[in-house]
Regions:
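Feature captures the catalytic cores and cofactor-binding loops of soluble hydro-lyases/lyases
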Residues: 3, 7-15, 24-136
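Phosphate/diphosphate-binding glycine-rich loops and adjacent basic-rich segments that engage nucleotide
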Residues: 137-146
Length: 146
């Protein structure tokens, strides 16, 4: 167990902001058709976490999956509070990035996105459902135990 406030990992900030929530290590997910935008529930019946919710969680996801429409769904989820508080990934995810950017531009709501090196990503994912705080600046970001 990591002490509250202790740094867990550092990475490259893809989108600035701060987000705190219980981590949800998850396989690739499409927000378009894979998640109910109203409550954040995973509705993709083929997904390992079917029935879980992304609402208020720190998604620890290697990369997204799906169409460009997923950006619109993510932006709407951030607006209505059914989206994740932060996304931690191991690869630059343009679709998720566009969704987070749209949420800030249109609604003034932020969802930080942090890219980690593969080893750091696997270490964070292995922590499981623990409270995390993700803080992203313009270039760098960090994850701390919450």
């Amino acid at each position: 167990m990591t002490a509250s406030g202790a740094e867990v990992a550092r990475g490259r900030a893809l989108h600035p902001g701060d987000g705190t929530g219980v981590a949800l290590p998850i396989g690739p997910l499409s927000f378009w058709g894979g998640v109910d935008w109203r409550d954040g529930r995973i509705i993709d019946v083929h997904h390992d976490q079917h029935g879980e919710t992304v609402a208020g969680r720190v998604l620890v996801m290697p990369h997204g999956r799906g169409s460009s429409s997923a950006a619109v769904v993510l932006a709407e989820m951030i607006r209505n509070g059914s989206g994740p508080t932060a996304v931690v990934t191991r690869s630059t995810e343009v679709i998720l990035l566009v969704g987070a950017m749209a949420a800030v531009e249109l609604y003034g709501r932020s969802c930080p996105i942090l890219e980690l090196e593969p080893d750091d990503f696997e270490r964070v994912a292995a922590l499981g459902a623990v409270p995390l705080h993700v803080a992203c600046g313009d270039d760098a970001g960090s994850i701390r135990a919450a």
